[in-house]
């Protein structure tokens, strides 16, 4: 049940606890300052080892309104293991189930304000916050949305991939985690995504994937627009065919202009600039037409 902080207690202490058990979580080497006053516990630089890494917390837990306890806190995270965070935090299971499929660790910071329920767990649809996470070395497999992207670009190797140096900035509001545009480098492929995920595990992301020359003929399209919808368990990935068609037409047009420029005697340096080629092709065509007319008029 709810731990009600007594209103008539006013004291502070330096905590130094070897092990603390809370729900499914274990906190080791917990130390920092606790200030109890007016039905509220303030936590100052409360450091603890958990989830394979370290967390430093600054914030408060308040039962000033016992029917609506709340927590406001900032967390500094260092080397937290993705899989352990998924296993131990119900919030992660509901809002970021992809953590189950990630191997590696992450660091960063999170700031949250949330009501708490009778089990002292966050009431997620009341949560507001923001933060950023970064990882230097991440591998993943079994993520259905990524599998569908791999199928769309005909590169099955992307289904099991390693990601280097990724940073993710996000906000939490109205039961959704919204991410700012972020880049994922998947081997020779570059994926840029932004969007949100919800408590109901729905996904609403848009993005672009940039293809390398090694992708073969499809790489002539350079960049594909993507949309990821559905849910984590049943994602729906679609490729913007209008974007593909537009880029395909442009690529063919560029090649045609280049060949025409070469036939009209333009050097390779001139054909490197598309706008320049268009202008020079027009000029050359006009010259050819004038020459033809002069010959006919003689």
Task: For the regions a language model picked out, list residue spans one by one.
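Small-residue helix/turn framework positions
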Residues: 5-267
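Protein-protein interaction and targeting regions used for scaffolding, dimerization, and localization
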Residues: 242-298
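N-terminal leader/targeting segments and the immediate start of mature chains
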Residues: 1-8, 296
């Amino acid at each position: 049940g709810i731990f009600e902080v007594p209103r008539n207690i006013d004291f502070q202490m330096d905590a130094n606890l070897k092990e603390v058990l809370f729900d499914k979580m274990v906190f080791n080497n917990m130390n920092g300052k606790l200030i109890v006053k007016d039905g509220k516990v303030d936590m100052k630089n409360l450091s603890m080892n958990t989830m394979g890494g370290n967390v430093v917390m600054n914030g408060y837990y308040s039962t000033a309104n016992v029917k609506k306890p709340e927590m406001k806190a900032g967390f500094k995270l260092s080397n937290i293991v993705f899989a352990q965070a998924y296993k131990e935090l119900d919030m992660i299971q509901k809002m970021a189930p992809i953590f189950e499929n990630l191997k590696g660790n992450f660091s960063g910071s999170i700031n949250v304000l949330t009501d708490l329920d009778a089990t002292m767990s966050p009431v997620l649809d009341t949560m507001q916050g923001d933060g950023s996470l970064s990882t230097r070395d991440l591998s993943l497999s079994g993520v259905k949305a990524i599998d569908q992207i791999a199928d769309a670009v005909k590169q099955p190797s992307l289904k099991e991939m390693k990601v280097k140096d990724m940073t993710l900035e996000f906000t939490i509001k109205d039961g959704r985690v919204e991410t700012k545009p972020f880049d994922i480098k998947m081997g020779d492929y570059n994926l840029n995504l932004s969007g949100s995920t919800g408590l109901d595990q729905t996904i609403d992301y848009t993005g672009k994937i940039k293809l390398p020359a090694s992708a073969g003929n499809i790489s002539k399209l350079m960049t594909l627009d993507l949309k990821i919808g559905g849910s984590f368990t049943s994602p729906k990935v679609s490729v913007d065919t209008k974007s593909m068609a537009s880029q395909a037409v442009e690529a063919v047009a560029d090649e045609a202009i280049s060949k025409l420029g070469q036939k009209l005697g333009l050097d390779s340096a001139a054909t490197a600039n598309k706008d320049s080629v268009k202008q020079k092709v027009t000029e050359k065509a006009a010259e050819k037409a004038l020459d033809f007319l002069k010959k006919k008029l003689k």
